[in-house]
């Protein structure tokens, strides 16, 4: 199976899963964010070692700071605010509907599966930071790190 077929298969499975199960709850979104944080922290030394092996001349401290610890503020912010970000927003209804008793609101809904292509110059950071927003919004992701970007 080639990369195109593999990605199509993953996309098909994720779409079917989302249609079957619907939008994830806020608690599940927070759980995904916490698991993402744990995954990054549990593997931070492996990430840094792999980056050093790939780039050869990058400081391990710089990689740890930019590629690993640079992700944590985004995750912490999302965990703290995901409930607020997903609240229904009441809006005023336009004339003449407002005077007729109409109610207007904005309800944010996930798209389902989101495609994400990340470049390779800061591979850990640029692959994981977008996942924070994707998971907080209740979406799933098909991620591809482009080797020539």
Tell me the role of every PLM-derived stretch:
Residues 145-149:
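Conserved small/polar residues in nucleotide/adenosyl-binding loops
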Residues 111:
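Phosphate-coordination loops involved in phosphoryl transfer and adenosine-cofactor binding
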Residues 119-128:
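Conserved coil-to-alpha-helix start sites within the AMP-binding
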Residues 1-103:
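N-terminal Rossmann-like NAD(P)+-binding subdomain of aldehyde/semialdehyde dehydrogenases
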Residues 140-141:
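A short hydrophobic/small-residue beta-strand
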Residues 135-136:
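Short hydrophobic alpha-helices that are characteristic scaffold elements of the AMP-binding
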């Amino acid at each position: 199976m080639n990369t195109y077929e593999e990605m199509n298969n993953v996309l098909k499975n994720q779409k079917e899963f989302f249609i079957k199960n619907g939008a994830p709850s806020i608690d599940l979104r927070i759980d995904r964010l916490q698991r993402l944080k744990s995954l990054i922290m549990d593997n931070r030394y492996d990430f840094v070692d792999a980056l050093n092996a790939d780039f050869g001349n990058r400081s391990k401290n710089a990689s740890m700071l930019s590629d690993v610890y640079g992700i944590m503020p985004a995750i912490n912010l999302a965990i703290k605010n995901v409930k607020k970000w997903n609240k229904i927003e009441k809006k005023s209804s336009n004339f003449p509907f407002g005077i007729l008793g109409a109610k207007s609101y904005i309800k944010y809904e996930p798209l389902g599966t989101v495609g994400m292509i990340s470049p390779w110059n800061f591979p850990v950071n640029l692959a994981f930071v977008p996942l924070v927003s994707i998971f907080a919004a209740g979406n799933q992701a098909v991620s591809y790190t482009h080797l020539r970007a």
